Amino acid sequence: MQPTKVLVIDDSKLIHTMFSAMFPKVPLVHAMDGMDALRRLGEHPEVDLIFLDINMPQMNGLELLDRLKADEVLARVPVVIVSTEGKEQDTVRGLQKGAAAYVKKPFRSEAVRELVGRLPEPALP
């Protein structure tokens, strides 16, 4: 897929910086946790790819994923889980809840871009 607007949800500013460098020509929307992500999605409903951390304050990634998949429009947007080593259970749960793929931290930029290229385009409503 060729994303046109990406939402990055992670409580690490370093991760946001890395994604900005990885996708310099793609507008990124940044959120620090699940609640912040819901606010940002209200402001930017046209995102077509989401990178989602699992362990965050206020609302974790799995809770947010449930909300995204319950929404008729947002359920079509591919979600890529970004998780740390040793959190395989959370990754498996995320895939069971409908995430399209996962990336383990630390990750290589080339591997993430390659993964995004293999994702299918979001289904049209």
Question: Model-flagged regions — what are they?
Answer:
Residues E85-G86:
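Short, conserved "switch-loop" micro-motifs in signal-transduction and mechanochemical regulators
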Residues K13-H30:
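Two-component/phosphorelay signaling modules centered on CheY-like receiver
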Residues M56:
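Receiver (REC) domain active-site loop signature in two-component systems and cognate sites
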Residues F107-V116:
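C-terminal output helix
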Residues H30-L49:
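Acidic, metal-coordinating helix/loop segments flanking the phosphotransfer/catalytic sites
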